[in-house]
């Protein structure tokens, strides 16, 4: 589930957040500097209770580029957290898939395994996506291992019935 938070400069934003019991962590993200380093940066992901605190990139022509390329463009691991071009950069798709390696040194998405601990899951109910003009708050409602089937290409998640069936399957295994 996602909550799009109203713009911070509006009077409505603090009230909505307060009523939901959500405090958005302050992040000092310099998107200008990040984009100077790599113009494919368009967001930042932060997952409390983990080491996930990284820029999010999307290559314009090669969906797998950041699987084996780092922020500076060098080839190798750990790569970057990224989305494929099938997802829009404004996070309005029914399902946005963020990719990243499960590194043995605990970096990238490796620490998402922390959510296998029920206490971590309960103490960290949200993760945050920061963009230049908005902050998105996502409620973590499931944490489970998934196979390598490409979700977006194998499920028509734009179809509300198929999307609901997909969510129902998640609720069954979580």
What is each of the regions a protein language model found here?
Residues 1-174:
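Solvent-exposed, non-transmembrane regions of membrane-associated and secreted proteins
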């Amino acid at each position: 589930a996602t909550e799009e938070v109203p713009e911070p400069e509006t009077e409505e934003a603090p009230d909505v957040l307060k009523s939901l019991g959500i405090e958005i962590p302050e992040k000092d993200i310099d998107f200008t500097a990040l984009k100077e380093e790599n113009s494919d940066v368009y967001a930042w992901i932060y997952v409390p209770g983990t080491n996930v605190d990284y820029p999010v990139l999307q290559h314009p022509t090669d969906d797998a580029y950041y699987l084996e390329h780092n922020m500076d463009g060098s080839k190798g691991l750990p790569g970057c957290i990224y989305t494929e071009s099938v997802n829009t950069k404004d996070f309005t798709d029914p399902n946005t898939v963020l990719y990243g390696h499960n590194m043995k040194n605990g970096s990238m998405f490796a620490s998402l395994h922390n959510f296998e601990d029920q206490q971590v899951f309960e103490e960290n109910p949200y993760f945050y996506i920061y963009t230049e003009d908005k902050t998105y708050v996502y409620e973590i409602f499931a944490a489970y291992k998934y196979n390598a089937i490409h979700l977006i290409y194998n499920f028509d998640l734009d179809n509300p019935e198929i999307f609901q069936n997909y969510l129902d399957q998640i609720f069954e295994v979580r």
